[in-house]
């Protein structure tokens, strides 16, 4: 009878869950993209904590596509996951995915990026507004007020891009920066390179670039080097590549997040919710400036 019960549970949960697991000990994670090392580290942090606490973690990659994200959430609810960790592709678009989970009474936790709509039990992220201001303050510390700056923005509609931009705007106002341009490069290294190439050619004397993530900053770095210019570059995330660029003197700084901790806290929070414990609606994760 016990063997029959275990087999039935496995069939209900699908191929992603082994016969030794049940729906009660399955946590699902939908990641915006696994092409970005930041989110790979976030996923690894979640996996490590899930292993430690004895949970099965099912991970799906949304490939920066809201439609794929929606399909992933539908898939995960069918698989029988009891709680969802979502790192949204975009804060507005993810509302449809959250609504699916809400209708099925599956608790949702958002990681790094928030959801503009739907019922989310807890949101775990860095203070992106504070981080954006930290980046601007660092530029002012190095170049003084009235610096000529460019901002490379992340994916439009994400809370991370909006909030980092809001924080940087506070620094712009405080230090009277001359903003030559602020354009999206979608958190992507190649787009960061291309956008920066165009702006360096059209905007002339650029003193500093704030990129809303390290991938764009590294793309900007290549463009600056190719143009044989001296420009102070500040990134955001504290990825391995970003930190290496800072320590080698190529980038001035990165505002370091803790993606592994964000993923880990997601699983810890899920564990508490599944046990019926109360959790905070917002769980902040500390930032720090890494410079040479």
Swiss-Prot record:
Q: What Gene Ontology terms describe what this protein does at the molecular function level?
A: monosaccharide binding
Cellular component, GO, one term: outer membrane-bounded periplasmic space
Could you tell me the Gene Ontology terms of the biological process aspect for this record?
transmembrane transport
Q: Where in the cell is it found?
A: Periplasm
One Pfam entry for this protein is Peripla_BP_4
Q: Which residues form the signal peptide?
A: 1-23
- Would the keyword Signal be found if you checked this record's keyword annotation? yes
Q: State whether keyword Transport applies.
A: yes
Q: What does this protein do?
A: Part of the ABC transporter complex RbsABC involved in ribose import. Binds ribose.
The protein, known as: Ribose import binding protein RbsB
- State the organism named in the record: Haemophilus influenzae (strain ATCC 51907 / DSM 11121 / KW20 / Rd)
Underlying gene: rbsB
């Amino acid at each position: 009878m016990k063997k029959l019960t275990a087999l039935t549970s496995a069939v209900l949960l699908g191929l992603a869950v082994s016969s030794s697991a049940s729906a009660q000990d399955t946590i699902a994670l939908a990641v915006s993209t696994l092409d970005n090392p930041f989110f790979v580290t976030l996923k690894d942090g979640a996996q490590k904590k899930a292993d430690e606490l004895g949970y099965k973690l099912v991970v799906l990659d949304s490939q920066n596509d809201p439609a794929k994200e929606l399909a992933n959430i539908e898939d995960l609810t069918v698989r029988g996951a009891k709680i969802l960790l979502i790192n949204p592709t975009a804060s507005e678009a993810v509302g449809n995915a959250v609504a699916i989970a809400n209708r099925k009474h599956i608790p949702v936790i958002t990681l790094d990026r928030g959801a503009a709509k739907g019922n989310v039990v807890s949101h775990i992220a860095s203070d992106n507004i504070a981080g954006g201001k930290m980046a601007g303050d660092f530029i002012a510390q190095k170049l003084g007020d009235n610096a000529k700056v460019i901002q490379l923005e992340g994916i439009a509609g994400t809370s991370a891009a909006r909030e980092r931009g809001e924080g940087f705007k506070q620094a712009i106002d405080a230090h009277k920066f001359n903003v030559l341009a602020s354009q999206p490069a979608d958190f992507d290294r190649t787009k960061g390179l291309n956008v920066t190439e165009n702006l360096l050619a059209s905007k002339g004397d650029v003193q500093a670039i704030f990129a809303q993530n390290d991938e764009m900053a590294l793309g900007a770095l290549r463009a600056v080097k190719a143009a044989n210019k001296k420009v102070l570059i500040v990134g955001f995330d504290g990825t391995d590549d970003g930190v290496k660029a800072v320590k080698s003197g190529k980038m001035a700084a990165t505002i370091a997040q803790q993606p592994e901790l964000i993923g880990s806290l997601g699983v810890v929070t899920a564990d508490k919710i599944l046990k019926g414990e109360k959790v905070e609606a917002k769980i902040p994760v500390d930032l720090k400036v890494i410079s040479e």
